[in-house]
């Protein structure tokens, strides 16, 4: 179909074949040069998107538009006489336009984008339906197609066969379900209703594929136990051993006791009763018994075959030597039309070189031609496919192959039928053909099957040589032909050879003059005696070509067999292959080990990094929590600070303004040194308990406040003494109002006035000296002794007063002690600000630090 041509070799009135394959056509114009008598139109391998302008081809019987870009198929709706429609490998998404095609018998829609299959129900005459390699998820209703014989659904996404009994026609004989998504082997039970099913394919489904978790099992006997009339499964003829196992599973075993959903239980059972055996030594005792029974049966069948062959030799020789004496040369086409076809033979003819597809052609032969060519000597089973090819390729990957032939040659259309790989030649009306085929199938299972095939092929070649030489010699001696007739016949032969069918259909035995000598038997060629002399050189050349083809086929067979035998039975080769596998395995293990080590190292590094980050985050979180708790505590204490206490400065490093800016004397310098020492001592005591965090809550910040309080305490005592001695009462004035703003103003005025008072400066120096002594005593002694010492120091601190003022001083001190005892809450607040224990510091028990009295 690769070259565009118009086949006009048919008889007038029978129509013609128009082939426009590979012409780069994108559309079918209105001026389509298609005559009314065209019965076959081939448009393969173009760029056609839409079928249009086909209405004038009303007599069209066969249409092929494969490998194009069709999206819809409504263009075929008006071709009511169509019998063969070939539309594979397009982009058709829906089946349409088939309502009026009541004569359609052969439909191929493989390799499209179909999702349903119910739209073909209107084609009730359909016999062959190919819907492979689509997107069909479930079996559709095609029960109205009562004439359907072949249904191809491989390469889809079918998951269940539950609707098969209701949706599939009963007369179906060929069913392909390979390469789908059937996961339960028990689904095969739904095919038991197809009583005429002979060929089935279930391969490359998940339910029959080997998995590491499931032991190996042979599913073929189980399928045969449900489909009792099955002859071919997954492209291989069912052997008698498998039939016996299937019968045992059906009658005595548990083959039919499992239901859909029990796939695992079924597989485990089949692994025990039908295990996979790769060598003869692994066969069980039951298999050995079956093999013994079958070997005896094959022996008797071979004896019967040899007897039947001897009986047929004599009538075959008589037919071959019979010569039809006709007064003039007649064409093969005329003789064929005169002879009525009496037999139809379905045979394998080969593999297409372009599409790699298997197909069979239905041929019509006269009775004499059938008796001569298709004798039992020529019937034998050959399998040139190696085991590796069977494992690596799908036996049903082939699709329906369209081959146009003349409509007048066969009363039944379509003329192309699909058969699964491995089917042998079958004679439909011969009772002994089935027995012979079974004998040959069993013969292939023998240990010496190769020798028998070689002997049979050699005998066929020798017989062919003898027949050709006998016919040529007899024709040369008995039927001379004029020279002019020989030349004209030779020219006519060459002319018809140029217009013959494609090479892929060369063995289809079509009745064109080009391949009539190749397809017809020597007995058929005896009808044309005047053509024998013209064909003698061509016959000799064909013999050489045939011998070369046979030698090439034999070489290929021998190479395949030697390779298979070496790989499986040669110990040295098996050892080398085993070493290679071990080496590859070791290298793979080393590579995986390195990868695991690298991943483990990365994991450890990541773990260490994660641990460090977690520790850092945990440490920071603890710090934040401690700071937040400390800040909350400080804020609570500041909130509970009494309103009569002046605000405290938060900066220790801020310079303290001098108390005596105008009058500097040695006593003021010494007072400044004592103040600095007291500040440093207070900072040293508070540093271990409260680190500097930036908040205004350090204990050392209270030193100015304490100093002011002590200053005011001393001033009040001095003022009382001055009032007793007659000094001026205007020096110190107690302020009773404790308002915070008035206190701050009065404190600043008092500071300015006290800086100008030399007497107040002397009193402050004496007070600081007493405070320093109290601090030293507190560090050296326990709390009780320190408290006693503090009282004695406070009692005897003013040494410059005379005896008359001592009594007054003791009275003032006792008054101050009473005031201190009346304000324990203020002492408690000061101690909480410093972070000390609940009891007050004994060094400050004699001081009134909670009450601030500012002089005016």
From Swiss-Prot:
LRRCT domain location: 211-249
Biased composition (Polar residues): 498-513, 753-773, 812-833
LRR repeats: 37-58, 59-80, 81-102, 103-124, 125-146, 147-168, 171-192, 196-205
GO CC annotations, alphabetized: centriole; centrosome; cytoplasm; protein-containing complex
Domain IQ intervals: 550-579
Residues recorded as bearing Phosphothreonine in the entry: 534
Cystines in this chain: none
Keywords, in A-Z order: Cilium biogenesis/degradation, Cytoplasm, Cytoskeleton, Leucine-rich repeat, Phosphoprotein, Repeat
CDD domains cross-referenced by the UniProt entry: IQCD
SMART domains per the UniProt record, alphabetical: LRR_SD22
One GO-annotated biological process of the protein: negative regulation of cilium assembly
Skewed-composition ranges (Acidic residues): 776-787
Domain of life: Eukaryota
Residue(s) carrying Phosphoserine: 308, 410, 497, 521, 755
Primary localization class, coarse: cytoplasm
PANTHER family: CENTROSOMAL PROTEIN OF 97 KDA, PROTEIN PHOSPHATASE 1 REGULATORY SUBUNIT SDS22-RELATED
Stated role: Acts as a key negative regulator of ciliogenesis in collaboration with CCP110 by capping the mother centriole thereby preventing cilia formation. Required for recruitment of CCP110 to the centrosome.
Subunit structure: Interacts with CALM1, CEP76, KIF24 and TALPID3. Interacts with CCP110. ENKD1 competes with CEP97 for binding to CCP110, destabilizing the interaction between CP110 and CEP97 which promotes the removal of CCP110 and CEP97 from the mother centriole and allows the initiation of ciliogenesis. Via its interaction with CCP110, may indirectly interact with HERC2 and NEURL4. Interacts with MPHOSPH9.
Record's protein name: Centrosomal protein of 97 kDa
Organism listed in the record: Mus musculus (Mouse)
């Amino acid at each position: 179909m690769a070259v565009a041509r118009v086949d006009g070799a048919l008889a007038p009135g029978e129509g013609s074949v128009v082939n426009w394959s590979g012409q780069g056509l994108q559309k079918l114009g209105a001026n389509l040069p298609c005559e009314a008598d065209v019965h076959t139109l081939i448009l393969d391998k173009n760029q056609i998107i839409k079928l249009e302008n086909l209405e004038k081809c009303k007599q069209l019987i066969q249409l092929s538009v494969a490998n194009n870009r069709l999206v819809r198929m409504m263009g075929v709706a008006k071709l009511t006489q169509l019998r063969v429609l070939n539309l594979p490998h397009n982009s058709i998404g829906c089946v349409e336009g088939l309502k009026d095609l009541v004569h359609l018998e052969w439909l191929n829609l493989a390799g499209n984008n179909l999702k349903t299959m119910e739209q073909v129900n209107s084609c009730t005459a359909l016999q062959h339906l190919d819907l492979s390699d689509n997107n069909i998820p479930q079996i559709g209703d095609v029960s109205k197609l009562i004439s359907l014989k072949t249904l191809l659904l491989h390469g889809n996404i079918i998951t269940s066969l539950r609707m098969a009994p209701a949706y599939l026609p009963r007369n179906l004989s060929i069913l392909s379900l390979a390469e789908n998504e059937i996961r339960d082997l028990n689904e095969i039970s739904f095919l038991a209703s197809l009583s005429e099913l002979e060929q089935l394919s279930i391969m490359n489904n998940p339910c029959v594929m080997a998995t590491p978790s499931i032991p190996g099992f042979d599913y073929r006997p189980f399928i045969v136990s449900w489909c009792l009339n099955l002859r071919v499964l997954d492209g291989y003829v069912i052997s008698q051993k498998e039939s016996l196992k299937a019968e045992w599973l059906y009658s005595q075993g548990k083959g039919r006791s499992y239901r859909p959903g029990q796939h695992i239980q079924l597989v485990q059972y089949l692994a025990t009763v039908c295990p996979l055996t790769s060598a003869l030594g692994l066969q069980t005792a039951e298999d050995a018994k079956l093999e013994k029974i079958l070997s005896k049966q094959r022996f008797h069948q071979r004896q019967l075959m040899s007897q039947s062959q001897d009986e047929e030799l004599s009538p075959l020789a008589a037919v071959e030597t019979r010569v039809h004496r006709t007064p003039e040369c007649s064409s093969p086409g005329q003789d064929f039309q005169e002879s009525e076809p009496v037999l139809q033979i379905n045979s394998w003819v080969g593999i297409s070189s372009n599409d790699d597809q298997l197909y069979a052609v239905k041929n019509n032969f006269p009775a004499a031609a059938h008796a001569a060519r298709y004798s039992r000597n020529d019937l034998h089973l050959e399998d040139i496919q190696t085991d590796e090819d069977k494992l690596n390729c799908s036996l049903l990957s082939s699709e329906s192959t369209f081959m146009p032939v003349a409509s007048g040659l066969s009363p039944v259309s379509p003329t192309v039928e699909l058969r699964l790989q491995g089917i042998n030649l079958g004679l439909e009306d011969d009772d002994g053909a089935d027995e012979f085929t079974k004998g040959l199938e069993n013969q292939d299972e023998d240990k010496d099957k190769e020798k028998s095939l070689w002997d049979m092929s050699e005998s066929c070649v020798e017989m062919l040589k003898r027949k050709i030489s006998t016919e040529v010699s007899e024709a040369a001696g008995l039927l001379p032909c004029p020279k002019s007739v020989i030349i004209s016949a030779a020219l006519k032969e060459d002319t018809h050879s140029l217009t013959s069918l494609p090479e892929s259909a060369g063995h289809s035995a079509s009745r064109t003059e080009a391949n009539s000598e190749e397809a017809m038997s020597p007995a058929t060629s005896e009808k044309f005696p005047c053509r024998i002399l013209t064909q003698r050189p061509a016959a000799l050349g064909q013999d050489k070509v045939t011998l070369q083809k046979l030698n090439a086929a034999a070489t290929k067979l021998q190479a395949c067999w030697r390779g298979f035998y070496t790989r499986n039975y040669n110990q040295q080769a098996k050892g080398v292959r085993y070493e290679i596998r071990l080496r590859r395995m070791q290298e793979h293990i080393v590579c995986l080990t390195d990868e695991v080590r690298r991943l483990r190292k990365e994991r450890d590094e990541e773990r260490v990094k994660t641990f460090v980050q977690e520790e850092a985050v945990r440490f920071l979180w603890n710090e934040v929590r401690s700071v937040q708790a400390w800040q909350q505590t400080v804020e609570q204490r500041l909130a509970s600070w009494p309103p009569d206490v002046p605000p405290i400065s938060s900066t220790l490093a801020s310079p303290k303004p001098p108390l005596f800016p105008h009058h500097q004397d040695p006593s003021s310098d010494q007072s400044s040194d004592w103040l600095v020492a007291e500040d440093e001592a207070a900072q040293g005591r508070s540093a271990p308990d409260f680190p500097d965090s930036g908040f205004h809550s350090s204990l050392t910040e209270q030193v100015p406040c304490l100093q002011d309080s002590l200053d005011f305490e001393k001033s009040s005592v001095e003022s009382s003494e001055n009032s007793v001695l007659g000094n001026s009462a205007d020096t110190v004035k107690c302020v009773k109002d404790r308002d915070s703003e008035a206190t701050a103003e009065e404190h600043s005025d008092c500071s300015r006035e006290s800086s100008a008072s030399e007497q107040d400066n002397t009193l402050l120096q004496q007070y600081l000296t007493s405070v320093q002594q109290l601090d030293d005593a507190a560090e050296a002694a326990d709390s009780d002794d320190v408290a006693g010492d503090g009282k004695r120091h406070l009692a005897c601190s003013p040494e410059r007063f005379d005896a008359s003022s001592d009594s007054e001083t003791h009275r003032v001190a006792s008054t101050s002690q009473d005031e201190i005892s009346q304000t324990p809450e203020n002492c408690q607040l000061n101690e909480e600000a410093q972070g000390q224990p609940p009891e007050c510091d004994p060094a400050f028990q004699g001081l009134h630090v909670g009450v601030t009295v500012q002089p005016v």
